[in-house]
UniProtKB/Swiss-Prot annotation:
This is Phosphopantetheine adenylyltransferase. CDD domains: PPAT. The lineage of its organism: Bacteria, Thermotogati, Thermotogota, Thermotogae, Thermotogales. Homohexamer. Reversibly transfers an adenylyl group from ATP to 4'-phosphopantetheine, yielding dephospho-CoA (dPCoA) and pyrophosphate. SUPFAM superfamilies: Nucleotidylyl transferase (SSF52374). GO terms for biological process: coenzyme A biosynthetic process. Substrate binds at residues 8, 40, 72, 86. Pathway: Cofactor biosynthesis; coenzyme A biosynthesis; CoA from (R)-pantothenate: step 4/5. Its cofactor is Mg(2+). Its EC number is 2.7.7.3. It comes from Thermotoga neapolitana (strain ATCC 49049 / DSM 4359 / NBRC 107923 / NS-E).
Amino acid sequence: MVAVYPGSFDPITLGHVDIIKRALSIFDELVVLITENPRKRCLFSLEERRKLVESALKNVDRVRIDVHRGLLVNYLKEHGIKVLVRGLRAVTDYEYELQMALANKKLYGELETVFLTASEEFSFVSSSLVKEVAMYGGDVTEWVTPEVARALYEKLKEGKR
C-alpha cells in the first residue's frame, strides 16, 4: 500500500525523517509530498526544499519525492492514493490535524489519515523552531542533517546582505 506524507518541509527536520522511516514500517511505499501552504511564508523555494528532502532521504528506500501546488486531495485522487500520514507532536497539533483530516475525508470519502506521534527526542522539533534558532546563530545540527544545516545557515546569511 502507498501512503502520502505531505508537508512544506521548510526545512525538513530529523523529526520528519523519523516519521518517514516509521511510516515505512507500515506502508510499502511513501510519497513525501512537498506542498505550498498559503498560510506559511517559506524560507526555501519549492525546488530548494525538494533538493533538501532528497539529500535528507538519500539512504531511505521505498520513498518517492514529489511536489504539488494546489489542493492535496486532488493529488491523492489523481494518483489513486487513499492514505495520508501525519505526524503529531502535541495536543495542539492533534486539534489542527483532526480538523484537516475531517475536511479531507469530506472532500475525498475514501481517504484515511494515519497519525504517528513524534518520537520523544523530536517531540519539540519543528521547522519553525529550527529556522528561529539558526537565525540567532544557534546550533541546529541535532535537529537537521548536515546538508540542511549548511543550506539553512547560507540562506539566512544571504538574507542579511
